[in-house]
From Swiss-Prot:
Protein name per the record: Erythronate-4-phosphate dehydrogenase
PROSITE patterns named in the record: D_2_HYDROXYACID_DH_3
Catalytic site positions: 209, 238, 255
Binding site for substrate: 46, 67, 259
Subcellular location(s) of the protein: Cytoplasm
GO CC, alphabetical: cytosol
Length: 348
């Protein structure tokens, strides 16, 4: 079995080399029709577009993307060509929730927001959105949920309309997949009409897909004061991001909200397990990320502990200083562990 692997997928080399006869590692942008021609499987990230132009005439039978999102895979073509594909749903949901929690603490520290007096609207309540809701409730924030597909499927009254969330929420965070058309279209879900309906002084957060928010409408809302702040991890036209938007946001990061070592290990494990199931290979290889250098966090408050474990301002400062290095900052992302890897002692 021959497998082509994105060379930035962590913790995969030893495991995949026990499974496959031949493994080739390349940057995600360098997958070509010639390269995949005689491959049996691909393990990719979002930077590799898997469609007819890449796959036509190849031997590829299976594609695993080590990501939650799969809009970079032409699923209709794969179905037509008999190619099985899989993603890694929920792999980095705790990582994104960690990012959002830290961002909320930063807003409280630097903007004087009292989180226990705020209302947050969570748009998209899947694996990630559900964990973000848990975090918000733990911090004493009132939560409103919006998820049209779930609302219709479950016939539930727990969900609010997007209009209601826009009018009532102090903070709105997006956790939806990108659908460019159809009944549940999310492309430019936050457009100028959405921003004009917002509660004045609201904060927007986006860790889903850049195209969910219309960039020019977001910029105008920031310029006019409709929005007080924005936390942006995903951007339209990545890696060629809007520099004015980067300058205006309180936190702007290079699509790394889900990049904890724990989330990456989950994604790699899920991709390998799916590969083994498809090709009927037995393996018991375990993937564990490296331990943090200092496992003991001792400080006066949980807020301080959370920001000692992960402070997104470090990633934001790096991107604002070097916006042209978007891809490099993603690809060379340093070790970041989630809260469960530490022993936290609150001394106050």
């Amino acid at each position: 079995m021959k497998v082509i692997v994105d060379n930035k997928i962590p913790y995969i080399r030893e495991a995949i080399e026990q499974i496959a006869d031949e493994v080739i590692y390349v940057p995600g942008k360098d997958f070509t029709p010639e390269l995949v021609q005689d491959a049996d499987a691909l393990i990719i990230r979002t930077r590799t577009r898997c469609d007819r132009s890449l796959l036509a005439g190849s031997k590829v039978k299976f594609i695993a993307t080590a990501t939650i999102g799969f809009d970079h895979i032409d699923t209709a073509y794969c179905r037509e060509a008999g190619i099985t594909w899989t993603n890694a749903p929920g792999c980095n949901s705790a990582s994104v929730a960690q990012y959002i929690q830290s961002a909320l603490f930063i807003l409280q520290q630097t903007r004087g927001m009292k989180l226990n007096q705020m209302t947050i609207g969570i748009v998209g309540v899947g694996n990630v959105g559900s964990k973000v809701a848990d975090v918000a409730r733990k911090l004493g924030i009132q939560v409103m949920l919006n998820d049209l597909p779930r609302e219709e499927r479950e016939e539930s009254t727990m969900f609010a309309s997007l209009k209601s969330i826009a009018e009532k929420c102090d903070i709105i965070t997006f956790h939806v997949p990108l659908y460019k058309e159809g009944k549940y279209k999310t492309y430019h879900l936050a457009d100028k009409h959405f921003f004009h309906s917002l509660k004045k002084g609201a904060v927007i957060m986006n860790t889903s897909r850049g195209e969910v928010i219309e960039t020019e409408a977001l910029l105008e809302a920031l310029r006019s004061g409709i929005l007080s702040d924005a936390v942006i991890d995903v951007w339209e036209h990545e890696p060629d991001i809007d520099l004015e938007l980067l300058e205006k946001v309180i936190i702007g990061t290079p699509h790394i909200a889900g990049y904890s070592a724990d989330g990456k290990a989950n994604a790699t494990r899920m991709s390998l397990e799916a590969l083994c199931r498809f090709f009927r290979i037995e393996t018991d290889y375990r993937i564990t990320p490296p331990e943090p250098k200092n496992k003991l966090i001792s400080t006066a408050t949980y807020e301080e502990a959370s920001l000692m474990i992960y402070d997104p301002r470090r990633d934001s400062d790096a991107l604002k200083s070097h916006p042209g290095l978007f891809e490099q900052l993603r690809g060379d992302y340093p070790l970041r562990r989630e809260e469960g890897a530490y022993r936290i002692v609150i001394t106050k």
